[in-house]
Amino acid sequence: MKIDITSLNGDSAGSIDLDDSIFGLEPRQDLIARMVRYQLAKRRAGTHKTKGRAEIARTGKKLYKQKGTGSARHGSARVPQFRGGGRAFGPVVRSHAHDLPKKVRALALKHALSAKAQGGGIIVWSDASATDAKTKALKASFAKAGLLSALIIDGAEVEQNFALAARNIPQIDVLPVQGINVYDILRREKLVLTRAAIDALEARFK
């Protein structure tokens, strides 16, 4: 797949052939969905908690005698059926993370990249750099290029001025290539890759 390379200002800088084994697959939505579920589950805090009957601060004394009252027999007042009692099978503090094989994760990333390429959502830049760490100037450049919602992936390190200028722009995410992930690719309209990012991705999946 051939795609044009541009600069941040929109100037043409040639073209590049994208590897079909990474960017030219027929997207599998099931793999992408599994990966998104894996990512979202892993980032959950899991700090939910309710008190069970053993944790309620209330007497454990038998409410009234077993027989002769005409009422249902009861023991502790901490049981779930009473107001103020413990919650039965309530949430506990835990990790929601689950396993997903490494090969499935790698394949899901390829399919997410292919889906974005198939929809015309990939833009290739020669590099991602800024002369000054000025958000206003960079935001104007993005608006001129029509980038209102984008994930920008650079090489192993993001140029400092560019990272500082872009970090406060809404719906613009900037990551080094090792941070690329399926969820962030899908949640933004455009995926911007630098030449360095493409070289790193092709080396990673070779």
UniProtKB/Swiss-Prot annotation:
Pfam families: Ribosomal_L4. One of its GO terms (cellular component) is ribosome. Keywords: Ribonucleoprotein, Ribosomal protein, RNA-binding, rRNA-binding. The keyword tRNA-binding does not apply. The keyword Secreted does not apply. GO terms for molecular function: rRNA binding; structural constituent of ribosome. One of the primary rRNA binding proteins, this protein initially binds near the 5'-end of the 23S rRNA. It is important during the early stages of 50S assembly. It makes multiple contacts with different domains of the 23S rRNA in the assembled 50S subunit and ribosome. Forms part of the polypeptide exit tunnel. This is Large ribosomal subunit protein uL4. It comes from Methylocella silvestris (strain DSM 15510 / CIP 108128 / LMG 27833 / NCIMB 13906 / BL2). The gene is rplD.
